[in-house]
Amino acid sequence: MFDTLLDPLIDASHKGFPHASAALRLSQIGAQGWNVLRGDLPLPLAVIRQDRLQHNLAWMQQFAQSRGLGLAPHGKTSMSPQLFRRQLDAGAWGM
């Protein structure tokens, strides 16, 4: 079941998904070649750069650990099981 949360089926009922496109797994979206600046995606939407996300995850975990703290991010803020998993994998003790 958790794999389904990490790679859900996304369709036009999801904010930011093109209305004319067929449903896709989350893992398939990057291969579509969609471009925000070309207007391929409806607005509003968020763009998350993997390199910056990875940097922020590592930085926050190191910041907490260097102060003897455990990190338990507030999951409701992002509402994203994929981000929950990344935070837990980076060392957060809970969500």
Model regions: which residues?
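A charged N-terminal "starter" segment
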Residues: M1-M95
